[in-house]
């Protein structure tokens, strides 16, 4: 009987040990599952946070690109308005030679060229259509210089030093270009009522 009791005792101890191992295993499994769930939640939260950041960045990028496109289109419209304004201005002054005030304007333009080339031997470059007016202005002012009828312009003239190093452009076209280059902002303000329209 002692042998049977011993076997029962061993079996009972083995059963208890088995139950204890199973309980420990269940606790470990539960702990692992809780940890996995916590990690999964953290990973999910990180993924959501990254997705939110990515969406915000993409949204901001798209807004920036849209604003840039709007600015580009506004700039193109402004440039077209400026181009149109200068084209109309050029058309309006294209018949200036027939205006009674042209000789006085031509005299002023000639004096500006002469002044810009002061101290130099001067060559005036004129449109053949202005040869009479130019001769009259030079006689009136007493200025002596060479004249070359070698440019085509809607009005005005240019001049160079005899050696060609110094040039003074005073055609109406060159004056319009200078105005265009230096006064674009003012022109935009006049056309649109401000730099931002």
UniProtKB/Swiss-Prot annotation:
InterPro entries linked to this entry: ATPase_E_C (IPR038495), ATPase_V1_Esu (IPR002842)
Gene symbol of the encoding locus: atpE2
GO biological process: proton motive force-driven plasma membrane ATP synthesis
SUPFAM superfamilies: V-type ATPase subunit E-like (SSF160527)
Subunit structure of this chain's protein: Has multiple subunits with at least A(3), B(3), C, D, E, F, H, I and proteolipid K(x).
Mode of membrane association: Peripheral membrane protein
UniProt protein name: A-type ATP synthase subunit E 2
UniProt KW keywords: ATP synthesis, Cell membrane, Hydrogen ion transport, Ion transport, Membrane, Transport
The family this protein is said to belong to: Belongs to the V-ATPase E subunit family.
Disulfide bond residue pairs: none
